[in-house]
């Protein structure tokens, strides 16, 4: 049996703004919110991020394996939005990419302080 993550909750101060920003940066679409309490963003056929409001929360780290073309498109939007980025979770604003595992990687924070990671890994 293959185990696949179906959804996870992403805490946010403003769930709709956070979901909209994530969708714009990642080139995705907001799902219909009418039937749910959450602000959902479908990442792929298996995974949906459910943004939910919370007054207090710790920051989380969300890592996404993407194709080279997806990396280029998302990274362009990160830079166009003026979001600081870096090569590691401990250097989020060094303006560099990493080449770990033979691919490219980058880290950046969203408005709620969550660390988002993009990585390409040759298959």
Predicted regions and their residues:
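Short acidic/glycine-enriched loop/turn segments that link adjacent beta-strands
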Residues: 35-38, 58, 93, 100-102
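Short, flexible helix/strand-to-coil boundary loops that buttress conserved ligand/catalytic motifs
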Residues: 22, 75, 120
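Vicinal oxygen chelate
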Residues: 5-13, 55-81, 83-123
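Core segments of cupin and vicinal oxygen chelate
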Residues: 2-3, 9-48, 53-55
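Generic alpha-helical hydrophobic packing signal
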Residues: 27-28, 38, 43-44, 78-81, ...
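Short beta-strand segments
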Residues: 47-49, 60, 116
């Amino acid at each position: 049996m293959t185990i696949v993550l179906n959804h996870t909750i992403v805490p946010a101060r403003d769930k709709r703004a956070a979901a909209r920003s994530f969708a714009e940066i990642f080139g995705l679409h907001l799902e219909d919110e009418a039937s749910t309490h959450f602000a959902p963003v479908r990442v792929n056929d298996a995974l949906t991020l459910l943004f939910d409001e919370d007054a207090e929360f710790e920051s989380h780290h969300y890592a996404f394996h993407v194709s080279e073309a997806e990396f280029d498109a998302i990274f362009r939007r990160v830079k166009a939005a003026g979001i600081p980025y870096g090569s590691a979770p401990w250097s989020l604003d060094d303006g560099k990419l990493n080449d770990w595992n033979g691919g490219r990687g980058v880290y950046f924070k969203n408005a709620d302080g969550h660390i988002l990671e993009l990585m390409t890994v040759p298959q």
